[in-house]
Amino acid sequence: MLEQGLLVTAGVAFLISVALSPLFIPFLRKLKFGQSIRDEGPKSHQKKSGTPTMGGIVIYVSMMVTTLIMAIKFEHLGAEVSLLLLVTFGYGLIGFLDDYIKVVKKRNLGLTSKQKLLGQLIIAIAFFAIAKGQGFDTHLMIPGTDITFDLYWAYFILVLFMLIGGSNAVNLTDGLDGLLSGTAAIAFGAFSIIAVAQEQYAVAIFCMAVVGAVLGFLVFNANPAKVFMGDTGSLALGGAIAAVAILLKQELLLVIIGGVFVMETLSVIIQVISFKTTGKRVFKMSPLHHHYELCGWSEWRVVVTFWSVGFLLAVLGIYIGVWM
């Protein structure tokens, strides 16, 4: 019965997101909350300048309302839901401030890297402290095995790394119309299946609410995008998916299910290291999706390819997390 309720959860979040977006997009235009495009980015992206941003607010509202309604209905409103909403709201707020400074204060870089890192660190510490207070253990499980290691306080460092790194990795992926919306829906969908297998229904409800919310947003975010989620959405989704992996004790599996985010991040790291040490670039541009654009791929082809890779990695992650 609850499994059917999870589909209803996704459906409700989808409908809320689809209903809110047409109302919110004109509001963003009226406020002149338009995306500015970097000059050093692909030239084809210049036509996107002025597209409303901060649409991640729609994703958050749709997800939060649906999660609370369904968690209460199925009597799964507990510490897990509170922690997930805390992280999503906290990282979403950081993203909102970053977007606000960019579009309203006209400061292209938004928050400074130190300001952003400090905010991410505070949210991550709060998450760990609350989880530890709820009796959350510090074991790390090797996916597909019964092997676990107690990391003790080193687990605290792992949590910080996952939440901060995860939010930034997902943020890097949000560079093409619909790219992040699609890959996020796939990844959260995979974790919802693992959550059901573990009978962690509160986490499953949250994941399916996110799936519905981002798919509803994708209707307006697919190429050509009528709205961007901005850092408001991408940082929130990144923090949320890392928190989900931590609560499910599938920390290492996040590397597989979130493989697209990992590849995007590695491409940036490799590019920076290569340029600083040799003066040469490995990729035509990073993150990786821009490299393929400059190789002549259409934006839609890049997006669908990355969705496909994300789907295959999600299937692999489900196989390891559920059946191995």
Curated annotation (Swiss-Prot):
Q: In which pathway is this protein known to take part?
A: Cell wall biogenesis; peptidoglycan biosynthesis
Top enzyme class, one word, equals transferase
Transmembrane spans:
5-25, 52-72, 77-97, 117-137, 147-167, 176-196, 202-222, 227-247, 253-273, 302-322
Q: Which cofactor does it need?
A: Mg(2+)
Q: Which UniProt keywords apply?
A: Cell cycle, Cell division, Cell membrane, Cell shape, Cell wall biogenesis/degradation, Magnesium, Membrane, Metal-binding, Peptidoglycan synthesis, Transferase, Transmembrane, Transmembrane helix
Q: Give the way it sits in the membrane.
A: Multi-pass membrane protein
Classify the source by domain of life.
Answer: Bacteria
| Biological process, per Gene Ontology | cell division; cell wall organization; peptidoglycan biosynthetic process; regulation of cell shape
Family, according to the entry, reads as follows: Belongs to the glycosyltransferase 4 family. MraY subfamily.
Name of the protein described by the UniProt record: Phospho-N-acetylmuramoyl-pentapeptide-transferase
User: What organism does the record attribute this protein to?
Assistant: Bacillus cytotoxicus (strain DSM 22905 / CIP 110041 / 391-98 / NVH 391-98)
Q: Which gene encodes it?
A: mraY
